[in-house]
UniProtKB/Swiss-Prot annotation:
Gene Ontology biological process terms from the UniProt entry: apoptotic process; maturation of 5.8S rRNA; regulation of gene expression
Post-translational modification: Phosphorylated by PRKDC.
Region (Interaction with NCOR1 and NCOR2): 100-141
Protein's name in the database: Nuclear nucleic acid-binding protein C1D
Primary location group: nucleus
Length: 141
């Protein structure tokens, strides 16, 4: 469509949207080709279990989203189709993985360092005798 003459089969107002849609489909196609060029087993061997779960969830979400778009292009309301429940289920698992990731990133308490920090931060008054002894030593020199 890009660079072609405007087709009279559809309203001129949507030409820009159709061009953007075509470009998006081309980008998705390129990403899928890149992703499919590496075998799944080869990819997963390089990742830790949490990263593997993320890859699986993103793949499942992408496929279901593409099916959602397909249903919409066929005139089927995807909101009334079981694909909606599947997308919601995947979203729940994505949130669980995000919670696990956030827990791993959360700071951990180093009790020794915390007690040293608190101990050094507290003010301790000097004994009265210590200051007098220090002053006497200075005056004799």
């Amino acid at each position: 469509m890009a660079g072609e003459e405007i087709n009279e089969d559809y309203p001129v107002e949507i030409h820009e949207y159709l061009s953007a849609f075509e470009n998006s489909i081309g980008a998705v196609d390129e990403m899928l080709k890149t992703m499919m060029s590496v075998s799944r087993n080869e990819l997963l061997q390089k990742l830790d279990p949490l990263e593997q779960a993320k890859v699986d969830l993103v793949s499942a979400y992408t496929l279901n989203s593409m099916f959602w778009v397909y249903l919409a292009t066929q005139g089927v309301n995807p909101k009334e189709h079981p694909v909606k429940q599947e997308l919601e289920r995947i979203r729940v698992y994505m949130n669980r993985v995000k919670e696990i990731t956030d827990k791993k990133k959360a700071g951990k308490l180093d009790r020794g360092a915390a007690s040293r920090f608190v101990k050094n931060a507290l003010w301790e008054p000097k004994p009265k005798n210590a200051s007098k002894v220090a002053n006497k030593g200075k005056s004799k020199s």
